[in-house]
Amino acid sequence: MEEKQNAVLGTAPLGRLMMKFALPCTVSLLVGALYNIVDQIFIGWGVGYLGNGATNVVFPLTVLALGLAVMIGDGACSYVSICFGKNQPENANRAVGSAVALSVLVGIAVAVLYAVFQMPLLSLFGATEANLSYAKEYFTYITIGVPIYVFGQAINPIIRSDGSPQFAMLSMLAGAIANCILDPIAIFVLHWGVMGAAAATVAGQVITAAMGVWYLFHTKALRLKADNFKLRGRILGAYLPLGLCSFLAQISLVIAMAATNNMLVQYGAFSKYGADIPLTVLGIVMKVFQIIISITIGMAAGCIPIVGYNYGAQLLRRCRGVLWRLMGAEFLLGVLALLITQLFPRQIIDLFGSESELYNEFAVTTFRVYLCMLPLATVNKAAFIFMQAMGRPVESAGLSFFREVLLAVPLVMLLPKAFGLMGVLYSMPAADILTFFASCFVLLRTDRQLRK
């Protein structure tokens, strides 16, 4: 049964197979992104833009925890798929067991660090005098849920690699629905403000994690034993590098957000908008961008088991077929997202509360400038993940690091010197254009190798 299930990855029509795996993965990640969007919408109407500004300060710290989770989960997912392609099920079982144990330990460690260094971290990510009290309150409750969040996000790609993308999707969907129901109750009925939004988020994460625990006792191809949950250096060394791209993508984003938030506060203070409007607006735009990128990553990450299996089985023609189908779909997604954000920025920003005309003016400008290269951004992100699926962590992580650290951070620091606050907005499209050339080089070289 196990061999038959895995063999489908090497024989089924690629288009149908990609849809089968990518759709549930995309929905799972999209639902995860909606956690933040839902919080922003209800906080915007129930607390105001300072509350949204506070959640934007905390957001990079959530991304950091996510980065550690996906390094473990995506790395294990890639390794498990390759093991199945090579008919090495015991190595797959050991990788999953150690990934589960590691995610629990990492989640606890991160929560302790967040609790101990709360104030320095909030200051680092751009908290202002006006939003600091909201940020502290929100961050305190988010920190309590970090171990649960890390486990839930790490186990999700592992469930997909076991051939259950639909269950992975449902576990995320259940948590998100709970969050959507509890958010308005906590904010508008119980009047808990940002604390209520955080509590609703953690409650949703508990449901997702609980479903992940249930699945560990009802796996398909995997056969987990107590001995598999030990941390073995050889197994960790085999799969963690494969998740390095996912981690660097997130940690690089955290570094870029820290630089961006501080530049917004610094240059916004000398503009007509002040410090808090730019900080809040860009945070909301980034949440919308996260929805787009969640679809991008979902489409690409859903193909990881397909690429990993076929690469392990040396079915290179099928890997090449996935490559160009994926890149074409990602480019079309970017074009569609670009049209929506360019044509309807005011309608999008109105979802997050009613604010001043000055606020709306900066929001519209930010949408149209900051997101003007979305077709390139989606292709870049998919390129990072495809290289990870091929078992090439150096190229994958290198592209991600090049985009977020070597380009985005210097650009966001330098462009404001010439263009003021607008320079912060120019930094993202500039980084996407330059990264696109590097992505094309890597993808074309990979295509030549897959032709052989």
Question: Which functions belong to the PLM regions below?
Answer:
Residues 64, 179-183, 209-213, 291, ...:
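Hydrophobic transmembrane alpha-helices of multi-pass small-molecule transporters
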Residues 52-112, 149-168, 279-345, 378-399:
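Small-residue-rich hydrophobic transmembrane alpha-helices
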Residues 73, 142-160, 168-179, 197-210, ...:
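Short runs within selected transmembrane alpha-helices of multi-pass transporters and secretion channels
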Residues 20-39, 141, 175, 204-208, ...:
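Transmembrane helical elements of multi-pass membrane transporters/channels
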Residues 15-34, 38, 61-68, 144, ...:
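Residue-level signal for short hydrophobic patches within transmembrane helices
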Residues 47-60, 135, 139, 198, ...:
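Small-residue hotspots at the loop-to-helix junctions and early N-terminal turns
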Residues 1-22, 80-147, 189-244, 307-373, ...:
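Short alpha-helical transmembrane segments in multi-pass integral membrane proteins
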